């Protein structure tokens, strides 16, 4: 058995792929979601957003019965390219044993919301399928890169622009010698890092354990022992800033709040919106004005969970002690805004009174992700926004 394996994917017909596969709803407005569901009856949105479990299952089964979704005959790898105007990344979709996650050959870096993981578990259990891949990162491998380059010179089975504004293309690799070569090359890689899909990963692990205990004839070869992963080279992964919005000043006036945070930060008013270009520097938007914030003193070197992670620095030195923000997973006074929205969205949210103030952060770096994962540490939720992301439903 290999580290990463081929599989017989369940996928949409070529003419239906663009209407079946979906972008994460985290990236879409409610209006776009409603219109897409209405105009694309075969979209997976009509499975995930069905009124109940039964309707969801019925819709999924109907898509298979109607041959909107068909299963490949051969064990295959799927080469997957995502392109924007200024970025592209090419990965491979395969399956890995869940034991690789449990044994830390596949490593996560973020805390999860228990309720969200449970929702994912129930959804996959109901459909008896994994519709969207875990998004993984592997250390660059020149031989894999060359192999992939050759394959993408051929015509793709899918090529379309999705609701996320990205171009998505896919190629099938099912020739036995090429499949074996990919398997062997992945066997030289020590570990894969989870970029996105921590809740899905935890749900898959729990679901696999449940099904194992329910099956008296368990062999370890059943499909529930595996999970689907889209793996991209580390050098091609892109992390955007993940910014914060806070509902109120925790009883402070603007003047007193700024006076208080000046005890720990150098605070300077800016003429324009402020996007940090180095670690341990933050932007703050409050009362129609931008400020730069820089820590007066570097944190103690023994506090590893704080060092080099701006999200923790902001929390421990400002959000928690001054604004009273507790665990960001459950505190409804804080919200999160991915960097692809732009800092103008912070201004829009604050100016419309959806939030009292916003903070712009320097993006978490890939070396931070790897360092935390290797040390079995976790970052707070919403620490990284990998962009672009794989679609759900191109292959299941």
What is the predicted role of each segment?
Residues 1-396:
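Surface-exposed, charge/polar-rich loops and edge strands
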């Amino acid at each position: 058995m290999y580290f990463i394996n081929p599989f017989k994917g369940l996928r949409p017909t070529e003419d239906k792929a663009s209407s079946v596969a979906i972008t994460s709803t985290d990236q879409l407005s409610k209006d776009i979601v409603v219109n897409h569901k209405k105009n694309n009856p075969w979209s997976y949105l009509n499975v995930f957003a069905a009124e109940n479990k039964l309707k969801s299952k019925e819709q999924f089964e109907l898509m298979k019965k109607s041959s909107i979704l068909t299963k490949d005959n051969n064990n295959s790898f799927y080469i997957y390219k995502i392109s924007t105007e200024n970025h592209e990344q090419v990965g491979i979709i395969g399956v890995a044993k869940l034991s690789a996650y449990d044994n830390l050959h596949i490593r996560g870096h973020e805390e999860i919301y228990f309720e969200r993981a449970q929702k994912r578990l129930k959804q996959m259990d109901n459909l008896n399928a994994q519709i969207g891949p875990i998004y993984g990162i592997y250390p660059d491998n020149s031989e894999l890169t060359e192999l992939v380059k050759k394959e993408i010179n051929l015509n793709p089975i899918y090529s379309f622009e999705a609701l996320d504004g990205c171009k998505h293309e896919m190629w099938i690799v099912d020739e036995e010698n090429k499949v074996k070569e990919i398997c062997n090359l992945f066997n030289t890689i020590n570990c894969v890092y989870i970029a996105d899909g921590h809740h899905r990963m935890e749900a898959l692990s729990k679901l696999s354990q449940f099904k194992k205990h329910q099956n008296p004839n368990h062999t370890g070869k059943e499909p529930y022992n595996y999970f689907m992963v889209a793996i991209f080279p580390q050098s091609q992964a892109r992390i955007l800033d993940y910014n914060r919005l806070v509902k109120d000043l925790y009883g402070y006036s603007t003047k007193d709040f700024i006076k208080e945070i000046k005890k720990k930060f150098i605070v300077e008013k800016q003429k324009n919106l402020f996007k940090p270009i180095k670690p341990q520097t933050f932007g703050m938007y409050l009362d129609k004005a931008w400020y730069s914030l820089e820590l007066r003193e570097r944190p103690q070197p023994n506090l590893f969970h704080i060092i080099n992670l701006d999200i923790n620095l902001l929390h421990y030195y400002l959000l928690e002690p001054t604004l009273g923000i507790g665990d960001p997973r459950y505190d409804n006074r804080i919200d999160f805004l991915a960097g692809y929205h732009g800092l103008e969205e912070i201004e829009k949210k604050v100016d419309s009174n959806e939030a009292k103030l916003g903070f712009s952060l320097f993006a978490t770096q890939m070396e931070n992700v790897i360092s935390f994962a290797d040390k079995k540490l976790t970052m707070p939720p919403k620490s990284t926004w990998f962009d672009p992301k794989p679609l759900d439903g191109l292959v299941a």
